[in-house]
């Protein structure tokens, strides 16, 4: 049981032995400490909390990186949102084995026009059911465009026609406040039961 938790922590990146950078920092701190102790004692105005000093030094260390080199960055972008340009992918599969590629395209927040005219009707029905399930799982939308042609969109796409909106992008729900009651509804009944 302990090994499962350890593996999970390693996978997520919160393991306890993830301090390779910490040892380097401690060595730098030790070297600087030995240099400052060998010189004369610091004046009271030069003393500052260690936390502020470490913050300032870490900022200085990152600013010393030469241009053209990349630093390690923990920010991961949303797939498919590189330029802010929406993309529609037209896929004309020949077999059901190509359907996971359609789901992956939807997960990358790209709309898919699926033309199933080439496929066998039974296999095409199976493919539509599969992609519709994947679309539902990512809160997307599906629309039949024509005979054996379907549009699948992720949740961030608004689908509309000349006559009106077919599917609108859901807005984030606002917190609703409930009116508070001064006396509980069950108060009278509870007192009757208690007697």
UniProtKB/Swiss-Prot annotation:
Biological processes, Gene Ontology terms? division septum assembly; FtsZ-dependent cytokinesis
Q: Which domain of life is it from?
A: Bacteria
Where primarily located?
cytoplasm
Q: Which Pfam families match?
A: SepF (PF04472)
- Localization per record: Cytoplasm
Q: Keywords of this protein's UniProt record, alphabetized?
A: Cell cycle, Cell division, Cytoplasm, Septation
Locate the region Disordered.
32-54
Gene Ontology cellular component? cytoplasm
The record's subunit annotation is: Homodimer. Interacts with FtsZ.
Q: What does the protein in this record do?
A: Cell division protein that is part of the divisome complex and is recruited early to the Z-ring. Probably stimulates Z-ring formation, perhaps through the cross-linking of FtsZ protofilaments. Its function overlaps with FtsA.
Q: Which family does it belong to?
A: Belongs to the SepF family.
The name this protein carries in UniProt is: Cell division protein SepF
Source organism of the structure: Gloeothece citriformis (strain PCC 7424)
Q: Which gene encodes it?
A: sepF
């Amino acid at each position: 049981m302990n090994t499962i938790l350890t593996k999970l922590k390693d996978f997520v990146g919160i393991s306890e032995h993830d301090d390779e950078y910490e040892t380097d920092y401690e060595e730098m701190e030790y070297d600087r400490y030995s240099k400052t102790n060998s010189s004369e004692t610091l004046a009271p105005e030069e003393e500052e909390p260690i936390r502020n000093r470490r913050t300032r030094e870490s900022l200085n260390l990152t600013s010393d990186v030469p241009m053209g080199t990349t630093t390690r960055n923990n920010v991961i972008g949303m797939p498919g949102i590189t330029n802010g340009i929406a993309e529609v992918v037209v896929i004309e599969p020949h077999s059901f084995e190509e359907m996971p590629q359609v789901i992956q395209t939807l997960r990358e927040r790209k709309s898919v026009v699926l033309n199933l005219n080439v496929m066998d009707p039974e296999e095409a029905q199976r493919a539509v059911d599969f992609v519709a399930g994947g679309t539902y799982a990512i809160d997307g939308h599906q629309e039949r465009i024509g005979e054996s042609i379907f549009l699948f969109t992720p949740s961030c796409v608004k689908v509309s026609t000349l006559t009106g909106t077919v599917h609108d992008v859901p807005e984030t729900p606002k917190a609703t406040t409930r009116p508070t009651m001064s006396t509980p509804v069950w108060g009278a009944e509870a007192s009757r039961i208690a007697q």
